[in-house]
């Protein structure tokens, strides 16, 4: 699986066991990602922070 880093088009190959790409952003500024990368389990959203997770190449 290949996931984008914070600034596309840069990406990295995920290590074994991290089978999701994710994008974390603040609810107040959804167009500005705070973090991107590979993750094993999609974190829960909170009142301030949301996560978008997906399992295809470079989908974050």
From Swiss-Prot:
Coiled coil: none annotated. It is found in: Secreted; Target cell membrane. Disulfide bonds join 3-21, 14-38, 42-53, 54-59. One of its GO terms (cellular component) is membrane. PROSITE patterns: SNAKE_TOXIN (PS00272). This is Cytotoxin 5. Keywords: Cardiotoxin, Cytolysis, Disulfide bond, Membrane, Secreted, Target cell membrane, Target membrane, Toxin. It comes from the Eukaryota. Shows cytolytic activity on many different cells by forming pore in lipid membranes. In vivo, increases heart rate or kills the animal by cardiac arrest. In addition, it binds to heparin with high affinity, interacts with Kv channel-interacting protein 1 (KCNIP1) in a calcium-independent manner, and binds to integrin alpha-V/beta-3 (ITGAV/ITGB3) with moderate affinity. Belongs to the three-finger toxin family. Short-chain subfamily. Type IA cytotoxin sub-subfamily. It holds the Pfam family Toxin_cobra-type. It comes from Naja annulifera (Banded Egyptian cobra). Expressed by the venom gland. One of its GO terms (biological process) is killing of cells of another organism. Monomer in solution; Homodimer and oligomer in the presence of negatively charged lipids forming a pore with a size ranging between 20 and 30 Angstroms. GO terms for molecular function: toxin activity. InterPro entries: Cytotoxin_Cobra, Snake_3FTx, Snake_toxin-like_sf, Snake_toxin_con_site, Toxin_cobra-type.
């Amino acid at each position: 699986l290949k996931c984008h880093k914070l600034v596309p088009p840069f990406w990295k190959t995920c290590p074994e066991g991290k089978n999701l790409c994710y994008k974390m952003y603040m609810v107040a500024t959804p167009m500005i990602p705070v973090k991107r990368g590979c993750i094993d389990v999609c974190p829960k959203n909170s009142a301030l922070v949301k996560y978008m997770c997906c399992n295809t190449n470079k989908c974050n």
